[in-house]
Design a protein with these regions (language model features):
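A conserved FAD-binding loop/helix module that cradles the flavin
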Residues: 330-357
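Beta1-alpha1 glycine-rich phosphate/pyrophosphate-binding loop at the start
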Residues: 11-87, 206-236, 305-311
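Short, low-complexity, charge-dense intrinsically disordered segments
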Residues: 135, 358-366
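A Rossmann-like FAD-binding core segment of flavoenzymes
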Residues: 86-99, 139-142, 212-307
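Short hydrophobic core segments
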Residues: 5-7, 149-161, 195, 280-289
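FAD-site-proximal beta/loop scaffold in flavoenzymes
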Residues: 173-186, 290-338
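Glycine-rich dinucleotide-binding loop and its adjacent helix/turn
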Residues: 158-211, 308-318
């Protein structure tokens, strides 16, 4: 019986594994992809414009060649960190189910609900009452495509890339339509359309324009004019180069009303004022965000709500425990939308979990 199963080996999962090892917990990390899989899926050569202390797990360890690290440097740092600290991470293993063991089998007592777990927001502030536990046994069975694990606690340390959002228009199923952007070189001198209003869409448009693609960014005017980082604007270090590309006629901007249809060799768009335009086209990147897969959490009884970037699990912001006792959450699929928040959450969560386990073991020993 493990103390903790961690699902996901991104910054949150790596940080949690490190803290678990430092605090003497028995644990395992299960990752369906690679170490730092979300970062691996960043565009090739991307510069990560966060400050170094927001990206590193321990201060002073990340040493990029320039002021900001590239995707490759950040990925290498996380992989090196895992290897140097001999963290127990299993990659390319997919979790297929998480079940709460029946109390009769686990020998645990189910607490009656104490109160309703309420999470309210005032701007960026989050306040909450302690969670009302939805039963459970404090013991869980985690099933993967390669084995079965038993643990008293489970931490979902997930990203939010499971379900890319769709336009739901005719022609979106064509092979030339992508829901992610990796690199520019296949699209040099091609007619590229990027649909989206966030940083990912802005970066893709910038890279393609700089590398010689005939590039059009289709964006809502409100998204283009938005300068509020809290509202998901295109960051200034992407926006300024985009404006330069516009001035040099290397990039075209289309203020979007909606996408009408994607066809072989062209795309039909409707402008913000209702005019329809047909653009010659070779490739379309639909970069309008993505959502996490919350199915397993919901099956366990975890409550969800609408967060900053979509549906998120409800959790205590002080302990990161959900309304289901023993189920914790951290990472980009929560309201911690940045890497620093994902890294810092386990630094709070794991010491509290250690304290809880120590008290429980002492009680059982009497």
């Amino acid at each position: 019986m493990l103390d903790l199963v961690i699902i996901g080996a991104g910054p949150a999962g790596i940080s949690a594994a490190y803290e678990a090892k430092q605090h003497g917990l028995s644990y395992i990390v299960i990752e369906k992809g690679l170490i730092g899989n979300t970062i691996y899926n960043y565009p090739v050569g991307l510069t990560v414009f966060s400050t170094i202390n927001e990206l590193e797990i321990n201060e002073g360890e990340l040493k990029p060649a320039r002021e900001k690290p590239t995707r490759e440097e950040l990925l290498s740092y996380y992989v090196r960190f895992v290897l140097e600290h001999d963290l127990n991470i299993r990659t390319e293993e997919t979790v297929t189910g998480v079940l709460s063991e029946p109390p009769a089998l686990a020998g645990g007592k189910v607490d009656a609900p104490k109160s309703t777990f309420i999470e309210t927001r005032t701007d960026s502030n989050v306040t909450s009452e302690p969670p009302a536990y939805a039963g459970g046994s404090d013991r869980f069975t985690v099933t993967t495509d390669k084995g079965v694990y038993h643990s008293t606690n489970v931490l979902f340390a997930l990203g939010s890339m499971d379900y890319p959002r769709k336009l739901n228009v005719k022609g979106e199923e064509f092979p030339k339509v992508y829901d992610h952007f990796r690199e520019t070189y296949p699209w040099v001198k091609k007619r590229a359309l990027i649909v989206g209003g966030g940083n990912s869409a802005g970066e893709a448009a910038l890279f393609l324009a700089q590398e010689g693609a005939d590039t059009t960014l289709a964006i809502f005017r409100g998204d283009w004019e938005n300068n509020d980082p809290k509202q998901g604007c295109i960051k200034y270090w992407v926006k300024q180069p985009l404006e330069n590309e516009l001035k040099e006629n290397c990039l075209k901007l289309f203020f979007l009303g909606k996408v009408i249809e994607i066809r072989e060799g062209e795309v039909e768009l409707e402008s913000e004022i209702g005019e329809r335009v047909v653009l010659p086209n070779d490739v379309v990147f639909v970069l309008i965000g993505s959502d996490a897969d919350l199915t397993m959490l919901k099956n366990l009884g975890v409550e969800t709500t609408q967060g900053k970037g979509g549906e998120v699990p409800v959790y205590d912001p002080e302990t990161f425990e959900t309304n289901v006792r023993g189920i914790y959450v951290a990472g980009h699929f929560t309201n911690q939308r940045h890497i620093k928040g994902a890294i810092d959450a386990p630094k709070v969560l794991i010491p509290l979990l250690k304290k809880k386990l120590t008290a429980k073991n002492a009680k059982e020993a009497k």
